[in-house]
Each structure stands twice: as structure tokens, then as C-alpha cells.
């Protein structure tokens, strides 16, 4: 008291003298040190010299300075007695300099100093001589240095010290002797050091210590009496160490309120582990390889508010919490719990939050005794049934998460007594129906992943709903999402952004609950709900998930029906003429006939879609989910892919066959084998079947859209599959183009007209050109989707899917019917019973097979091809009527005349 009065008196006298001196004529007030900033604080001065590039102490510091900040400079040393005249200095900051040593007397004369900051320097030991006799010092920061040694006399005379920072240094042991003199110390941190062991009575004289941080060390063992003497300790942090055993030494800490020892190697929590800590409020010990927890470990902790046991993978039995009646938040995730005791709520009447996610719980007890529950998290368990009594009378429950279970049965009145429930997550279960009773207050509803839940959910039961996730987009139609899209078109970008942000925030809510207070979560939740005034439903309806009509526009509808009718009629004519009875079918006509059959299958798949559109006209949303997930859609998708791929492959074989045939004919070589063509056809069919089956074998389905075809955008697996098909088909078209280009270039100029004009060669060229042109939009859209180019609207994609892809199914036979003269001959033969190919084998040109004759026939002119004397081998097909057709002879010909085939 005498010292304080003397200092105050001296301050008053000196201040008066300063005022008098400053009032003299010609005298000015003493200025602030040159690089610093000063601020008057009553009779005293606050001097800020931080981050000024100083290499030493500034001169002319006022003796009335109470606060001096010299941090973030380049000061390397402090001279002795440099600050001895600053008797009123209470806070000195020297952080962030290059001090390696502080000599004795550096702080001499600082009898009023209360706060000394020396962090972020280069000190290798505590400057014990410089710190002695700072009797008023209350806070000392020595963190973030290189201190590896604390002399025993370091803190002698620091009788008023309350806070000590020694973290982020290189200490390897507790400075036991140095701490003996700090009986008034209240908070100390020794974190981020290299301490291995805490000996007995390490803090024996720190009876006033309230907070002790020892986290991020290398502590692997504790003395059984290492915490003896810490009678006032309330917070103990042992996180991020190498402890192998539960710290049994905490039993002496009767006033302990907060305990953390997570992220260690503790494998067991013994029985009655906290028997000596009746004041414990919060404990964290997640991220330990805990294999065993004593049932009585958490008994009789009447003040415990929070219990977190994350990652205790070997816990198989729910802990006995008798006497722990104040528990408000219980987290026990990633364990092996199979059941919950029926008395869990009797033991925990004040429970507000319970998180038992990532366990193996199969049966739930009644939570009706937990009247204060606000949040229940049971996701990723094995719950099968929700009974009537499971959540009865939980009037305060606001969030219920039951996602990723096996729930197949929910009692119709399970949620009838939950008036405060605003968030319900039942995604990824096995639901076939959803009870709506009592859910009128919901704002968030998640039912995605329940593929068997196909019924529409009435919107009138959810007047406050703002965000919802459904198994199918059609279920969003009931909430006017489709109508809003129709009337408003594309929503405003700002509205979309706010909705997306809200949705993303909603997705992350449950993940934030471990780190945020639940009350704050609810406040933020309610504020976000007020921002959005319309229902945000996903997956959203659109052209590929229509609400009313499968095809949408009448133009598309008429176009599809026209394609279907033409494909049936025209392909039937081609098939009838090619495969007419008792006629010989050469390889090229066999390929054309098979393409017609495949085109009929493509028309059939489009016809199925057209029929579904007609049957569900104006009300497709009611049947959309049923159609997508049904067998009919799978078969339709299989036929579409199979027909599309087989058609391309057979066309490729036809192009190659024409090239080889013409080459053999013009060079008088042996003609290509019919057997090789048949083998190629079989290979095409097998490859198409493999491609069409691959989506089903890979776990995917054709039911990603109601059109039962892999989409050009959206689902990644479908898009990858579609791009792979486009690449394969593009390769086929490239091969065909190269083959025909090579054929054109290889023919001599004189022979070009005679050979190139042949009907079948021209027909395959026409098919190649037409199919290639029609496939360009499909390829372009596929690569656009792969590159995330969104300038093409979904309506255009839909038109391509429904019209362009099946269009070859009707164009291919039309081209044959309209432009190939063989069709006229074949249809005439079909009428009159004549067989053109049979007749050609009985003409005067019996030395040439009908297939070779067809190759050389021309559609409009009579061709005369003169061959040089050569040897030609002919293989005629066998017939049952005459063995004379089975022959292989060599003929010497000088010239062969061909009659026109018209």
C-alpha cells in the first residue's frame, strides 16, 4: 500500500510539473519518439512503436508511459537499465523481435509492470535474471520461442503472476522446480512442446491453477500422483498426445469441469473412471482406438453436460449413465452398438441432442421419456421399423435424422405427436409408403434413395415445406414445381443463387452440429427459411422428367408416331422381299434384310414410348416412377441400344463387303467368302448384346429417365456410357468412309462409271451418308455434355433423343424402297411368283454365279465389261432341286456381256 501511494503521489507531482513546464512561453510539449505513435490516456501515455523496423529501443520515451508496444521489429538486444525510468509502465510488448538473450537488469525499475510479452523471439531459455523481482507482473508470454531449459530460479519473486505461456517451445520435461514459486498462478499452457512424461507432484504448489493445457506434446505416461496439489483445476487439456492408458491421475481433481484427451492411443476407459470428478461438465475423448468402456465409467456425474465418444469402434454395449442426470448432449458414433437400453431416457431426462450414427442399431426403444429432446441423429444404422411409441410425445423435437437405415415399416401415427419437428431425413431406406400425419410443420424433408416409394405425396399436408429431396422428380410436381417452371421460365439468377446457397447450407447442417451450439443452429435455420418463399425440390422436374406429358409437344408426338408407322411398314416390305421363299439371298442382301429386322426393333422401342405417352396423357407424373423402375422400361432401353448398335455394326460390315467384292471383281480374284460375312454378322450381334447388357451388369439401369435410354447429360455413369458408344460408332463410320473412299480412288477412270453406278454399291453409300449425317447431332451433344457446355437446351436434347436417334429405322428401308431397282424386281417377283435370282442361274450365263451377276448389274444402263483372258473360280450355292449347281470349274473367257437389271 505504501508503494502504491508513493507512486501515485509521484505521478501527480511529475504531471503537475509537466503541465507547468508546458505552459511557459516558448516551451512546447515534449514530442513522441520519432517513429512511434502516442495516445494520451488521462495522466499517462500509450506509445505504439510496433512494426517500425526498429533495431533498438527508441529514445525520449515519456516517463508517464503506461503502455509500450515494441513488437514486430528487429530488436536484437535490450540494454540493462534501458527502461528504468518508466515507473508507470504496466504493459510491455516485445513480441516478434530477434531477441536471443535478455540480460539482468533489462526490466529494472518496472515496478508497475503487469503484462510482459516476449513471444515469437529466439530465446533458448527463460531469462531468469531479468525477470526476478517483477512483483506486479500478472501475465508473462514466452510462447513461440526456442526455449529448451527453464532455470529453477526463473520465476522467483513473481508473486503476482496469474498467466504463464510456455507453449510452442522445445521443452522436454515439466519445469517442476521453477513452478514451485508460482502459488498464485491461475492459467498455464505447456502445449506444443516435446514433453514425454509428467512426474508425480509436478504441479504440487499450483493450488490456484484453474486452466492447464498440455496438448500437442509427446506425453506417453503420467505419474499416478502427477496432478496432486491442483485443488482448483477446472480445465485440463491432454489432447493430441501419445497416451496409451486412461489418465487415472485425474481422480484427485475434484473441481475438474472440462477434460479433453482425444486423439491419443487410449484403448480402454475403466470402470468408475471419473469417480473423483463429480464437477465434470464436458469431456472429449474421440479419435482414440477405444475397445472397451466400463459400464460404470460415466456414472454419478451430475454436472456432465456433454459426452462425445466418436470413433470408439469396439464399443458394443451402451454405457450405464445412472446419476448423470444433467447430460444434454450425447454423441456415440462409429461404434458397434446393436441395441439401446429401454431405460435410456429414465437415466437422461434432460437430454437435448443424441447422436448415435454409424452404429448397428436394429431396434429402437421408446424415447418418450426424453421430453427435452431437440435433435435425434440415427443415420447409418440398421433400423427396420419405426413403431407408434418410438417418438411419441417428443413435443420439443425439431430434427430427426434416420437416413441410411433399413426402414421398411413406419406406423401411420409415428410422427403424429411431434408438433415442433421441422426437419426429417428418411433418405436411403426401404420405404414403400410415407405417413404424413402430424408433419404439417416440416420445412425440410428428405426421402431420396427410397426407390420403392413411388406414390405421389399430397402437398396439402406440408404447408410450411421449403426444402425437399424426393426419390423421383415426378413427386416434386405435386408441389407446383413444374407449374412454376412453365409460367416463369428460367428463374432469376439471384433467386437461383440464394436457393442453391440455402440448399448447400442445408446439406451441411448435420455436419456442423458437432462444432456449433444447437441453439445457434436452430436460429440460423429459421432465418434461412424466411429467405426462401417457394419449395426447393430435388430432383427437379423438366423436359426429361415431365409432369404432364412424356413427349411434351405435339410436334414430337406426331413425329415419333410417324417414325414408328413408317419403320413397321417399310421394314416389313424389305424383309418380305429379301427373305421371300425359295430365293437365293446373297451376302449383301442378307445384310440389308438383317438391318431391316434391327430397324424394326428400333421402331418397336419408339412405339412402346409412344404408347406410354398416350396412356399417361396429361398425368404422367402419377405413373412416371412406376414406368422408370419397371421391367418394361428396362426392356425398351435394351432394345434401343441393341438395335442402334447392331444397325451401325451391320452397316459397317456391308460397306466392307462391297469394297472387297468390287476389288475382287475388278482384279479377277477369287470372290470373298460368304462364310466370313456370316461370321462378321454373328460377331456384330454378340458385341451389340454385350454393349446393351453392360449397363445392367455394372449396377446401373436404363431407368434413369422415362425414355429408357442413357442420357446425354446428367448422371455421370450414363454420360460415360453414352460417350463410349459415340466414340465406338464414330470409329465405325470412319472405317466405312475410309473403305468407300479407298474403293473410289482404287478404281480406274474407265471402270468408275460401270462399277460405281451398281445399285447395291450406291445403296450402301447412300445409307452410309444418311446415317452419318443423322449421327452428327448425337455425337456433338455427347461431347458437349462431356465438356460441360450448356448452351443447348434440354428440349433440343429431348428432340434428338426421340426423333433423330430412331429416324434411321424408317429412312433406311425407305431409301431401299425408293432408290434401289432390286426392290422393284423383288416385289414384282413376289407378286408373280417369279424368282429373279433362281432364273439368273438358268440363263446362258450359267458360268457366272448370280451373286457375281448382281455385283455387276447396273441400275440404268447396259454395261459391257471386257475382261482379259483369265481364270475365274465360281462357287455356286447348293440347291435341293439340282446337283448341277454344285460345281467349281475354270473357264477361259474373252468377253462377257451383262444384261441390264431393270
From Swiss-Prot:
<dbReference type="GO" id="GO:0005886">
    <property type="term" value="C:plasma membrane"/>
</dbReference>
<keyword id="KW-0677">Repeat</keyword>
<feature type="domain" description="LRRNT">
    <location>
        <begin position="32"/>
        <end position="61"/>
    </location>
</feature>
<feature type="glycosylation site" description="N-linked (GlcNAc...) asparagine">
    <location>
        <position position="205"/>
    </location>
</feature>
<feature type="glycosylation site" description="N-linked (GlcNAc...) asparagine">
    <location>
        <position position="797"/>
    </location>
</feature>
<feature type="repeat" description="LRR 14">
    <location>
        <begin position="348"/>
        <end position="372"/>
    </location>
</feature>
<dbReference type="InterPro" id="IPR032675">
    <property type="entry name" value="LRR_dom_sf"/>
</dbReference>
<dbReference type="GO" id="GO:0032588">
    <property type="term" value="C:trans-Golgi network membrane"/>
</dbReference>
<keyword id="KW-0732">Signal</keyword>
<feature type="repeat" description="LRR 1">
    <location>
        <begin position="41"/>
        <end position="61"/>
    </location>
</feature>
<dbReference type="InterPro" id="IPR002131">
    <property type="entry name" value="Gphrmn_rcpt_fam"/>
</dbReference>
<feature type="topological domain" description="Cytoplasmic">
    <location>
        <begin position="740"/>
        <end position="763"/>
    </location>
</feature>
<keyword id="KW-0325">Glycoprotein</keyword>
<keyword id="KW-1015">Disulfide bond</keyword>
<dbReference type="GO" id="GO:0004888">
    <property type="term" value="F:transmembrane signaling receptor activity"/>
</dbReference>
<feature type="repeat" description="LRR 11">
    <location>
        <begin position="278"/>
        <end position="300"/>
    </location>
</feature>
<feature type="transmembrane region" description="Helical; Name=4">
    <location>
        <begin position="679"/>
        <end position="699"/>
    </location>
</feature>
<dbReference type="InterPro" id="IPR001611">
    <property type="entry name" value="Leu-rich_rpt"/>
</dbReference>
<feature type="disulfide bond">
    <location>
        <begin position="32"/>
        <end position="38"/>
    </location>
</feature>
<feature type="repeat" description="LRR 5">
    <location>
        <begin position="134"/>
        <end position="157"/>
    </location>
</feature>
<feature type="signal peptide">
    <location>
        <begin position="1"/>
        <end position="22"/>
    </location>
</feature>
<feature type="transmembrane region" description="Helical; Name=1">
    <location>
        <begin position="558"/>
        <end position="578"/>
    </location>
</feature>
<feature type="repeat" description="LRR 7">
    <location>
        <begin position="182"/>
        <end position="205"/>
    </location>
</feature>
<dbReference type="InterPro" id="IPR017452">
    <property type="entry name" value="GPCR_Rhodpsn_7TM"/>
</dbReference>
<keyword id="KW-0333">Golgi apparatus</keyword>
<dbReference type="GO" id="GO:0009755">
    <property type="term" value="P:hormone-mediated signaling pathway"/>
</dbReference>
<dbReference type="GO" id="GO:0016500">
    <property type="term" value="F:protein-hormone receptor activity"/>
</dbReference>
<dbReference type="GO" id="GO:0090263">
    <property type="term" value="P:positive regulation of canonical Wnt signaling pathway"/>
</dbReference>
<protein>
    <recommendedName>
        <fullName>Leucine-rich repeat-containing G-protein coupled receptor 5A</fullName>
    </recommendedName>
</protein>
<keyword id="KW-0472">Membrane</keyword>
<feature type="glycosylation site" description="N-linked (GlcNAc...) asparagine">
    <location>
        <position position="60"/>
    </location>
</feature>
<feature type="transmembrane region" description="Helical; Name=6">
    <location>
        <begin position="764"/>
        <end position="784"/>
    </location>
</feature>
<feature type="topological domain" description="Cytoplasmic">
    <location>
        <begin position="820"/>
        <end position="902"/>
    </location>
</feature>
<feature type="glycosylation site" description="N-linked (GlcNAc...) asparagine">
    <location>
        <position position="74"/>
    </location>
</feature>
<feature type="repeat" description="LRR 8">
    <location>
        <begin position="207"/>
        <end position="229"/>
    </location>
</feature>
<comment type="function">
    <text>Receptor for R-spondins that potentiates the canonical Wnt signaling pathway and acts as a stem cell marker of the intestinal epithelium and the hair follicle. Upon binding to R-spondins (RSPO1, RSPO2, RSPO3 or RSPO4), associates with phosphorylated LRP6 and frizzled receptors that are activated by extracellular Wnt receptors, triggering the canonical Wnt signaling pathway to increase expression of target genes. In contrast to classical G-protein coupled receptors, does not activate heterotrimeric G-proteins to transduce the signal.</text>
</comment>
<feature type="repeat" description="LRR 15">
    <location>
        <begin position="374"/>
        <end position="393"/>
    </location>
</feature>
<feature type="repeat" description="LRR 3">
    <location>
        <begin position="86"/>
        <end position="109"/>
    </location>
</feature>
<dbReference type="InterPro" id="IPR000276">
    <property type="entry name" value="GPCR_Rhodpsn"/>
</dbReference>
<comment type="similarity">
    <text>Belongs to the G-protein coupled receptor 1 family.</text>
</comment>
<feature type="repeat" description="LRR 4">
    <location>
        <begin position="111"/>
        <end position="133"/>
    </location>
</feature>
<feature type="transmembrane region" description="Helical; Name=2">
    <location>
        <begin position="590"/>
        <end position="610"/>
    </location>
</feature>
